[in-house]
Amino acid sequence: MTRSALLSVTLILGALTAIAPMSIDMYLPGLPTLGREFHAEAGTVELTLTAFFVALALSQLLYGPFADRFGRTAPLYVGLILYVVASVACALAPDIYTLIGMRFLQASGGCAGIVIARAVVRDLFESREAARMFSLMMLVMGSAPILAPIAGGYLLV
């Protein structure tokens, strides 16, 4: 694989892996605003995070077997479409309870990138190269907790 192709693969897989973490950290600065806008208590607003984490954990258990059975592309597209549709539904949620449900679906779709990106690395690279790719992907994903709250705060302004 050429150096430019390797860089492209690293950035794409890193971005797929960073989707769900970005959706957590970008969202945090807006929690107080959500409470005010939906006239909801802090505990109820925090359920949006709980729903996200539960779906993120449980859905990863499904994408692995689906990706093994149906290939990498179809489950990834299903997950990304679910993520985008749920994200739009989150933006249009009329109440906090709809938002909680949509955050659950958003995480269910967003975790496809986490699982399938790792599977693709195992498909494309041998053990030593795979370890290097995993570390590079984590470098890209590691920027999410740094950049996402800044972006989320900027979106609120």
Where are these regions (language model features)?
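Residue-level signature of the transmembrane alpha-helical cores
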Residues: L16, V78-L82, A86, M102, ...
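Helix-loop-helix hairpin linking two adjacent transmembrane segments in secondary transporters
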Residues: T98, L136-V157
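Conserved MFS/SLC helix-loop-helix module at the cytosolic interface between two early adjacent transmembrane helices
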Residues: L58-Y97
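Residue-level signature of mid-helix packing/kink "hotspots" within the transmembrane helices
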Residues: D25, F53-L61, P145-I146
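Cytoplasmic helix-loop-helix junction between adjacent transmembrane helices
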Residues: M102-V140
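Extracellular/periplasmic helix-loop-helix junction of adjacent transmembrane segments
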Residues: G30-L58
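Cytosolic juxtamembrane N-terminal segment immediately preceding the first transmembrane helix
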Residues: M1-A20
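Interfacial helix-cap and linker-helix signal at transmembrane-aqueous boundaries
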Residues: L34-G35, F66-A67, A151-V157
